[in-house]
């Protein structure tokens, strides 16, 4: 059955914008799990803000990671809101996928390696349906439990309200899988700044919109 808006929390769940830098943007550091938005990602965040500028949200939440906070920023400024940071909706902690160049000189090679790493992550998770195939990662079931707990806790505070949550592709997959009753923890590639809408009332959850990217078609 469908949950009425006045009886449920309506979660607009948004994946962060693109965070794979081009050669002229990258700053070699040796640590690449909390990258800022790329030039494309910043454009996507602005497009999202333009699309949702007339919407009303009762609260705004974000993963603490930089790419999510930067995706939220343009909309937060338009709506005069401040995101609440929620550690439970951070992306899964992954082990090493592939070695990255250690030197700081060849930024072209580093940029290419980061792009290939992202492709590998989606390929491995998509093929297996979970994250345990990547050694030394956060266990897939524990990750899903963490995400569901955090999302449901957000929902419990906002029955009859609409909130927006900025998070990650793995997080969206885990929560959508729980809503749909799927065993897989990863089953689709969530697009950058895509919108997924779920209504939640306790343990009752209904998926209304999934992976909506109408505002960023120029980047497809």
Indicate where each model-derived feature is located.
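Active-site signature of alpha/beta-hydrolase-fold catalytic machinery across serine-
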Residues: 74, 174-178
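Loop-to-helix element that buttresses phosphate recognition and phosphoryl-transfer chemistry
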Residues: 18-75, 136-148
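Acidic, low-complexity terminal tails and accessory targeting/binding regions
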Residues: 1-10, 84-85, 92-112, 156-162, ...
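Surface-exposed helix-capping loop/turn segments at secondary-structure junctions
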Residues: 54-59, 153-163
């Amino acid at each position: 059955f469908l949950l009425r808006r006045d009886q449920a929390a309506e979660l607009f769940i948004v994946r962060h914008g693109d965070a794979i830098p081009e050669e002229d943007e990258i700053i070699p550091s040796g640590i690449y799990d909390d990258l800022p938005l790329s030039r494309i990602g910043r454009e996507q965040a602005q497009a999202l803000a333009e699309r949702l500028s007339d919407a009303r949200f009762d609260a705004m939440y974000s993963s603490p990671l930089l790419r999510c906070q930067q995706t939220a920023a343009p909309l937060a400024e338009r709506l005069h809101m401040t995101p609440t940071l929620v550690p439970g909706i951070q992306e899964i902690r992954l082990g090493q996928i592939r070695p990255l160049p250690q030197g700081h000189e060849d930024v072209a090679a580093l940029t290419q390696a980061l792009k290939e790493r992202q492709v590998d992550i989606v390929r491995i998770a998509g093929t297996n349906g979970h994250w345990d195939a990547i050694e030394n990662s956060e266990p897939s079931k524990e990750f899903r439990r963490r995400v569901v707990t955090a999302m449901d806790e957000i929902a419990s505070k906002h029955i009859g309200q609409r909130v927006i949550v900025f998070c990650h592709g793995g997080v969206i997959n885990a929560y959508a899988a729980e809503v749909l009753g799927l065993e897989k923890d990863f089953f689709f590639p969530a697009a950058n700044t895509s919108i997924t809408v779920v209504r939640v009332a306790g343990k009752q959850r209904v998926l209304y919109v999934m992976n909506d990217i109408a505002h960023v078609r120029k980047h497809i």
